Curated annotation (Swiss-Prot):
Protein name: Small ribosomal subunit protein uS8c
Chief localization: plastid
GO molecular-function term, one example from the UniProt record: structural constituent of ribosome
Organism annotation: Chlorokybus atmophyticus (Soil alga)
Family to which this protein belongs: Belongs to the universal ribosomal protein uS8 family.
Length: 133
């Protein structure tokens, strides 16, 4: 049983990127679905599919994106910020810019999970889940 599904998802994607795997399978939940759809909308992953496992649970099959013949990953780094032992919150004025706006921060707000740009635009703060660049 996984206690932190977000950290598990980030670790699986990071490990699959390191060995240049095309697909990675992660546990499906509302949070992981939202994070995966943000990664797809921002162009970090190619495709997301929901599949049923043998045990009857649903999981996400994420197709990672690579560029060029050397298959350089679009995701350079994924970093978990708010952890179960140390939660990190920010209001709309304190939301950090990742690499000067090149990367994104994924934030859990009262209006759902969204990117840092959208949270600043809607003037909502929340828990900073992870950074992606």
């Amino acid at each position: 049983m996984v206690n932190d599904t977000v950290a598990d998802m980030i670790t699986r994607i990071r490990n699959a990127n390191l060995v240049r795997q095309t697909n990675v399978q992660v546990i499906a939940s509302n949070t992981t679905n939202s994070i995966a759809s943000i990664l797809k909308d921002e162009g970090f992953v190619e495709k997301i599919q929901t599949i049923e496992t043998d045990s009857g649970l649903s999981s996400l099959l994420i197709t990672l994106k690579y560029q060029g013949k050397r298959r350089k990953p679009y995701i350079t780094a994924l970093k978990r910020i708010s952890k179960p032992g140390l939660r990190v919150y920010a209001n709309s004025r304190e939301i950090p810019r990742v690499l000067g706006g090149i990367g994104i921060a994924i934030i859990s707000t009262s209006k759902g999970i969204m990117t840092d740009r959208r949270a600043r635009h809607e003037k909502v703060g929340g828990e900073i889940l992870c950074y992606v660049w």
